[in-house]
C-alpha cells in the first residue's frame, strides 16, 4: 500500500466496513443516473511503462487520443448525466472542447426542436452528458487526490446524498457506451462496486451510490484494496472479460488487445497512422 493510501485508510476502512448500510440496494429503488469522474494526469508524465516501445511524443499522442475516446463513450452512456474530467493538461482540455457544438449546454438543452436534437445527435453523438473540467489539486498530490477533487466537484451542488458517482480511468480506448452502461446498471444494485482490469489486479471503474462515501485507493493492487474497503467486485457475468471497460493500456501488449477489441475513432486514427508510417510497430 502506498503512503498516500496509508494516510487515509484507517478512518475510511472503519467507515466502509461498518454496518451503516446493507451491501445490496433494495430492488425497488428508482433507476440510477451517474456522474462519472475521469482523472487525467499531465500527458507528458503518463504511460511511462510504454517508454521502451513509444517515443515521448507518441506517448503523449496516444494518451490524448485515449482520453477523448474514453470520455466520448462515457458521455454517450444513457445513464450518465455528467462527466467531470480532472486535469491540468491544456492540450487535453483543448481536445475535449474541440468536439463541443455551437452554443452553450443550457442553450442546446433548452431548444426542444426535433431538428436541433437530431443535429446534435448525428454530429455529436457523445454529448448526451454534460462535460465539466476541474483543475487537479496538485500533480504532486497523486491520482487519489485528483479523484477526491473530482468527486467533491460532482457532489458540490447537492452533497453526498444527491449524486451517485463513478470513477472511470481515462485509458480505456475500446470502451463502448454499452460496456459502461451495463457495468453501471450492475453497480446500481450495490452501495459500492468495483470493476477490475483485464489481469484482475487493477481498477478501471469504482462506484458509490448517492449517500455513500467513495474512498479511492488507486495504485498497485488497487482491486484488492477497493474490495477490502467494501466495494463489491463485479464479475464476468456483469462485465464480460472481453468488455472494453476491462482493457486499460499500460504495456505494449495492451495496445494489441485494444486493437483486437476495436478502439474508438481518435485512438484508431493514431494507431493507423503509426502503422502507415512504420512507427510504434512493436506496440501496435
Curated annotation (Swiss-Prot):
Top enzyme category: transferase
Binding site for phosphoenolpyruvate: 203, 219, 222
InterPro entries given in the database record: CofC (IPR002835), Nucleotide-diphossugar_trans (IPR029044)
Annotated region (Disordered), positions in chain: 94-123
Keyword Nucleotide-binding: yes
GO annotation, biological process: F420-0 metabolic process
Biochemical pathway: Cofactor biosynthesis; coenzyme F420 biosynthesis
UniProt-listed Pfam families: CofC (PF01983)
Keyword Cytoplasm: no
Chain intervals with Basic and acidic residues compositional bias: 105-114
Annotated SUPFAM superfamilies: Nucleotide-diphospho-sugar transferases (SSF53448)
Enzyme Commission number(s) from the entry: 2.7.7.105
GO molecular function: GTP binding; phospholactate guanylyltransferase activity
Assigned keywords, A-Z: GTP-binding, Nucleotide-binding, Nucleotidyltransferase, Transferase
Gene3D superfamilies xrefs: Spore Coat Polysaccharide Biosynthesis Protein SpsA, Chain A (3.90.550.10)
Catalyzed reaction equations: phosphoenolpyruvate + GTP + H(+) = enolpyruvoyl-2-diphospho-5'-guanosine + diphosphate
Family: Belongs to the CofC family.
PANTHER family reported in the protein's UniProt record: 2-PHOSPHO-L-LACTATE GUANYLYLTRANSFERASE
Purpose of the protein: Guanylyltransferase that catalyzes the activation of phosphoenolpyruvate (PEP) as enolpyruvoyl-2-diphospho-5'-guanosine, via the condensation of PEP with GTP. It is involved in the biosynthesis of coenzyme F420, a hydride carrier cofactor.
NCBIfam families in the record: F420_cofC (TIGR03552)
Name of the protein described by the UniProt record: Phosphoenolpyruvate guanylyltransferase
Amino acid at each position: 500500500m502506498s503512503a498516500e493510501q496509508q494516510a487515509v485508510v484507517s478512518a475510511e476502512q472503519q467507515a466502509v466496513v461498518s454496518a451503516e448500510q446493507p451491501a445490496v440496494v433494495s430492488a425497488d429503488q428508482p433507476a440510477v443516473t451517474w456522474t462519472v469522474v475521469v482523472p487525467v494526469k499531465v500527458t507528458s508524465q503518463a504511460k511511462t511503462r510504454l517508454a521502451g516501445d513509444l517515443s515521448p511524443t507518441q506517448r503523449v499522442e496516444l494518451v490524448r487520443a485515449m482520453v477523448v475516446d474514453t470520455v466520448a463513450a462515457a458521455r454517450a452512456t444513457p445513464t450518465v448525466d455528467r462527466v467531470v474530467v480532472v486535469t491540468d493538461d491544456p492540450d487535453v482540455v483543448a481536445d475535449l472542447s474541440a468536439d463541443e457544438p455551437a452554443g452553450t449546454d443550457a442553450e442546446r438543452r433548452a431548444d426542444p426542436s426535433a431538428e436541433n436534437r437530431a443535429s446534435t445527435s448525428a454530429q455529436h453523438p457523445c454529448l448526451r452528458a454534460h462535460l465539466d473540467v476541474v483543475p487537479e489539486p496538485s500533480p504532486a498530490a497523486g491520482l487519489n487526490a485528483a479523484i477526491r477533487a473530482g468527486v467533491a466537484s460532482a457532489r458540490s451542488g447537492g452533497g453526498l446524498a444527491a449524486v451517485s458517482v463513478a470513477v472511470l480511468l481515462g485509458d480505456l480506448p475500446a470502451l463502448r457506451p454499452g460496456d459502461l452502461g451495463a457495468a453501471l446498471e450492475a453497480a446500481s444494485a450495490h452501495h459500492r462496486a468495483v470493476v477490475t482490469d483485464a489481469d484482475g489486479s487493477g481498477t478501471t471503474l469504482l462506484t458509490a451510490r448517492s449517500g455513500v462515501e467513495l474512498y479511492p485507493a488507486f495504485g498497485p493492487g488497487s482491486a484488492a484494496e477497493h474490495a477490502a474497503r467494501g466495494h463489491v467486485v463485479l464479475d464476468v457475468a456483469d462485465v464480460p472479460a472481453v468488455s472494453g471497460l476491462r482493457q486499460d493500456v499500460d504495456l505494449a501488449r495492451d495496445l494489441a488487445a485494444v486493437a483486437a477489441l476495436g478502439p474508438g475513432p481518435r485512438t484508431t486514427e493514431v494507431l493507423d497512422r503509426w502503422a502507415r508510417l512504420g512507427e510504434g510497430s512493436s506496440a501496435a
